[in-house]
């Protein structure tokens, strides 16, 4: 389902505000990167989500990984990094290149890569400050299993256009949720 532009922009503002408030000196371009990735995902829609209602699926996004005050900065940044890395991997598959406009897909790769680079620099800075583990093993597994469920769904649906549309909408939702971290 296509999100109204006002709702999409509200999600972007919340995401940008929260990730930038982590205090790890992420450049302003990181929040712009969040906006750009969400806008690109929105532009990638090829078919009406209403024609794919029968294909909807609950992938079990691990919201608990991104909720609450259980994270310090390095763990929060690490969780976002893992999510973006998994999104990059998902859209880098052979099935993905056949499903999407190549130009938009290339822009998405570039945007995600820039996000990863900025987060890695931020992680390096934060790890030097604190000696805490980057990400709880259970949290890491929860994020990876979530993306495994998505990959399995695509495989079971034979990478159909509706399956990709459901996944695209899910990734928009999870990207918004994963970058909307608590302030620390």
From Swiss-Prot:
- The signal sequence is 1-23
Q: Which GO terms describe its cellular component?
A: extracellular space
For this chain, the annotated S-S bridges are 24-122, 52-162
Q: Where in the cell is it found?
A: Secreted
Q: Which UniProt keywords apply?
A: Antiviral defense, Cytokine, Disulfide bond, Secreted, Signal
Q: Name one GO molecular function term.
A: cytokine activity
**Location, primary (coarse class):** secreted
Acetylation found in the keyword field: no
Q: Which GO terms describe its biological process?
A: adaptive immune response; B cell activation involved in immune response; defense response to virus; humoral immune response; natural killer cell activation involved in immune response; response to exogenous dsRNA; T cell activation involved in immune response; type I interferon-mediated signaling pathway
InterPro entries tied to this protein: 4_helix_cytokine-like_core, Interferon_alpha/beta/delta
PANTHER family in the record, alphabetically? INTERFERON ALPHA-5, TYPE I INTERFERON
Q: What is its quaternary makeup?
A: Interacts with CR2.
Give the family this protein belongs to, as stated in its UniProt record. Belongs to the alpha/beta interferon family.
Function noted in UniProt = Produced by macrophages, IFN-alpha have antiviral activities. Interferon stimulates the production of two enzymes: a protein kinase and an oligoadenylate synthetase.
Protein name per its UniProtKB record? Interferon alpha-1
Q: Where is the organism placed in the taxonomic lineage, from the top?
A: Eukaryota, Metazoa, Chordata, Craniata, Vertebrata
């Amino acid at each position: 389902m296509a999100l109204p532009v006002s709702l999409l922009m509200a999600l972007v503002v919340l995401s940008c505000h929260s990730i930038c408030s982590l205090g790890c000196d992420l450049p302003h371009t990181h929040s712009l990167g969040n906006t750009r990735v969400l806008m690109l995902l929105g532009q990638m829609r090829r078919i009406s989500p209403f024609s794919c209602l029968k294909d909807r699926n609950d992938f079990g996004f691990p919201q608990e990984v991104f909720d609450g005050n259980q994270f310090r900065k390095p763990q929060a940044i690490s969780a976002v990094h893992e999510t973006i890395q998994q999104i990059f991997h998902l859209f880098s598959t052979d099935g993905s290149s056949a499903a999407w406009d190549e130009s938009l897909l290339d822009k998405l790769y570039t945007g995600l890569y820039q996000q990863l680079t900025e987060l890695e620099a931020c992680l390096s800075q934060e790890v030097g400050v604190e000696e805490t583990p980057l990400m709880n093993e259970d949290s890491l597994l929860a994020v990876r299993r979530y993306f495994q469920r998505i990959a399995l769904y695509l495989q079971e649906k034979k990478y159909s256009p509706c399956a990709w549309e459901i996944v695209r909408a899910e990734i928009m939702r999870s990207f918004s949720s994963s970058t909307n971290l608590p302030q620390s």
